[in-house]
Amino acid sequence: MNAVGIDVSKGKSMVAILRPFGEIVYSPFEIKHTSHDINSLVDLIHSVDGESRVVMEHTGRYYEVLAHQLSEADIFVSTINPKLIKDFDNDSLRKVKSDKADAAKIARYALDKWQNLKQYSLMDELRNQLKTMNRQFGFYMKHKTAMKNNLIGILDQTYPGVNTYFDSPARSDGSQKWVDFASIYWHVDCVRKMSLNAFTDHYQKWCRRKKYNFSKSKAEEIYGKAKELVPVLPKDEITKRIIKQAVEQLNSASSTVEELRTLMNDTASKLPEYPIVMAMNGVGPSLGPQLIAEIGDVTRFTHKGAITAFAGVDPGVNESGTFSQKSVPTSKRGSADLRKTLFLVMDVLIKTMPQDDPVYQFLDKKRSQGKPYYVYMTAGANKFLRIYYGRVKEYLASLPQSE
């Protein structure tokens, strides 16, 4: 019974091997995340008499190299939430924080929780790629929002309110009508220096060239508003260059977002649960792949409560003696990215209002009872996850074993 505790960090790790009753098999030692050092660690673990189990914290992405390589070498690996390790064995007044002390603490945790350790399952390459793409998608969405706000801030000094003229959705290449419009009519003087007829003709030709819908009344509305606007920055080459650069940055981020959205949908469609997930209300070609990416393989969850705890939308419990709190906040100790995706799904359900959907009925019921926004949204996310778990697991069980 050998507990291998590994304190993982970037590029290197600290390893300690202990046995019950405080027996030290190997004092803490450092290894690099290289093939030579990892192979040496594998040989060392195999050489120790008795059953060995490796425990490490799943911190960021650093642990994945060791967890993957050790699992492939037929070594039992368990990855633990850092919060559980931090709260374990805090029975000393001294505060010791070092890699060696942490490795030994993780090994003691492994010994104490030996029977309850869950083995790390190798995520197949497709799911790993999908999850990585989703994290990149989230990063570029934040970047796109920042670029959009930056452009609007500049345009407020040259053509205030131009971003509100059109509400058409983004195209498949990420382009938007208001951004393309602002790229051509980047200053209010670009419009009002022309006559109404000249602007209408110019705007119509631009719509035809860009394949946008043209409306004469819209052109007249734009021209009328331009006459009343007061710009701050002058209409010169410096201002034009500033706006053109901001437009290029926004278009670049938007294009990347749409490419990732399409690629994620194509990748998710290769997974077995794709059709049953896409058939659920509130889920489309954007949110569907995000859900699949963040939840991963449903079969690794033993029951419905496990998947809600993984997302951090499970209801909390606060009881002591005769006291029992009725309304307890959720744990929020799970995946923040998954919770964000679930809230987006709930938002879609509220906007589309599918009357025959059980999750929407539940949301509408809680909302009609006067529950606060976050209460009924979180409760709806919990119910959605439970239904997701049941439907997907049942569907996967019905498939031939080869799939």
Which residue ranges define each predicted feature?
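A detector of single, family-specific signature residues
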Residues: 1-403
